[in-house]
Amino acid sequence: MRKRQDHRATNAGFIFVNDKCNPRVAVVDLHDFVTKQIVGSELIASEHGATFVTPDTDYVVETSQYPAPLGGAYAPIEQFNEKYRGAMIFWRFDKEKGRIVPEESWAMELPPYMQDLADCGKKVSDGWVFCNSINTERAYGGILEGKPPLESGATQNDMDYLHCIHWRKAEAVAKAGKTTTIAGMRTIPLQTMIDENLLAFAPEPKSPHGVDITPDGSAIVVGGKLDTHATVFSFAKMRALIDQKKFEGKDPYGVPILPFKDSIRGQCEIGLGPLHTQFDNQGFAYTSVFIESKVAKWSLKDMKVVGKIPTHYNIGHLSAAEGDTVSPDGKYLVAMNKWAIDRFADVGPLLPQNFQLIDTSGENMELLYD
């Protein structure tokens, strides 16, 4: 779920909610809390990295999760590498009418990795979007054929790929007609993405999950999930490498790959299972630590953890006051907890998750309310 945004902060006129199972996006008007519109495309079969909005809410971004033949066509799983693909859809949002305009929307074809969460650049990184991926191994299971199960096959590589996409330039390419229409959606082919220098990869530690851009837009924080670090990518470094075409190689589809060490500002040792990150107005980041069931507070400047607070359950997402905008409010954070462990509120067997309100205004985080 994402609110409408502008360059100042958040414009709370609408929220956009994605449906992971049936790839579609809903527009909810916050003036009356009524769902005004639901749109979807048969281009993709599933999604996860939605809904993220560009600054000024020109577009609502929806990213596929599981690769599939685009447009719902059939291809045997043995043709996974050749026929299966991911995609990212840019739904045009008319702010005056409060509606998505499908005929002004477009998409881009991506390699058949499992694209995950995404975030749009802001301020210095405005015009770019960054998307995590897992399963650069392109595993699809096959135990009966002697192949490793999907979960094992998809975690063989030490690095996956952070997708760095120049969406503003891609918009111009789409408007120039360099697209192919698939299932009614204008789509920039993968080869065109490469030829027009719209897409580059930066290696990121194994099976990452959260990707979150700092309030000033200068850095991209990636939660390791199967790595103990939060990796801080420097937008300035990556942009310079892309402009100078300093790549360490290409992926099997020809997408250029940036050198990892030259792309990052550093790494912060967070703990076991770092996922998502939010920010305050004092230069601190807050990362959910899934396996430890804690929230870690750490300094963006020093890249050192300054404190942790335990949560009820295995924490997944977290949300700070305006914590993903250009001007975070600070003071409060909500831990969104997933699975019941140890002590928990008796809210029934179907919904064991709960939220916790945490005060972040002081030197140490303090639990205010379960």
Residue locations for each model-derived region?
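Predominantly soluble domains enriched in secretory-pathway, periplasmic, or organellar proteins
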Residues: M1-D370
